[in-house]
Amino acid sequence: MAPPEAEVGAVMVMAPPTPGTPGTPGGPLITGMRVDSMSFDHRKPTPRCKCLPVMGSTWGQHDTCFTDFPSPDVSLTRKLGAEFVGTFILIFTATAGPIVNQKYDGAETLIGNAACAGLAVMIIILSTGHISGAHLNPSLTIAFAALRHFPWAHVPAYIAAQVSASICASFALKGVFHPFMSGGVTIPSVSLGQAFALEFIITFILLFVVTAVATDTRAVGELAGIAVGATVMLNILVAGPSTGGSMNPVRTLGPAVASGNYRSLWVYLVAPTLGAISGAAVYTGVKLNDSVTDPPRPVRSFRR
């Protein structure tokens, strides 16, 4: 609750934050109220998200939501460590679903495979997003850098962490599930043109949603993990039988290296990257500008 108005000339003494205050030890991860302690203005309840930190500007437009909610100072080493672990978890779980499905004669089904990937994305965003931004995908990293949401200087290191994590996870899967590794390889069952189009479209959809929850001050950033995970699940339900529903170059690259099967690999490297850039660019172009009369919410995103 906001403190009462101070009399003119009176000295205002602010009480220290209680353990229940977000950002203090023992405090909640997300709160539904934001109070401007400098002006004591009564603002509408506005949610805060601490899972996906952001900073910077987009196409010359300053994102004012960052001015009163600074990102923690996280070293690049910690970011890369979180990105490696997050990508490892994603590739291991998302690839294990189809492998188990093959090994046990369809026990997982398409819905199970989609759930493995979607739930993995959700929990990784919620657990590591505040550290590295939880990119987990070179296409996302490149798209955000191209649209000035992410520094180009960090792109090679992020991609190296993602690729190495994917290969490590894939060889771990090979050791556990050999000889069923082929079940986790994404290979098109349609023509190359159809596979390219499908991967482009589903990655476009994914980055459209990611850019919304990551960069728009009016999007519900607290639901970023759920929104992105649900999008991944939906896309796999749509494209899984045709292309495997990769949307991510390292989702295909790691299992391809571990199994030695590089069939149509270029489709899964090029189409998701082009789709990601297009999806992010389209949302950036259509999103509403911040209104002076409607204070933006302090949200965080995939940008670190």
UniProtKB/Swiss-Prot annotation:
GO terms for molecular function: active borate transmembrane transporter activity; arsenite transmembrane transporter activity; water channel activity. The modification Phosphoserine is found at residue 301. One of its GO terms (biological process) is arsenite transport. A motif (NPA 2) lies at residues 248-250. It comes from the Eukaryota. A motif (NPA 1) lies at residues 137-139. Expressed in rosette leaves. Induction: By boron limitation in the root elongation and the root hair zones. Keywords: Cell membrane, Membrane, Phosphoprotein, Repeat, Transmembrane, Transmembrane helix, Transport. GO terms for cellular component: lateral plasma membrane; plasma membrane. Disruption phenotype: Plants display lower boric acid uptake into roots, lower biomass production, and increased sensitivity of root and shoot development to boron deficiency. Aquaporins contain two tandem repeats each containing three membrane-spanning domains and a pore-forming loop with the signature motif Asn-Pro-Ala/Ser/Val (NPA). PANTHER family: AQUAPORIN NIP2-1 (PTHR45724), AQUAPORIN NIP5-1-RELATED (PTHR45724:SF11). This is Probable aquaporin NIP5-1.
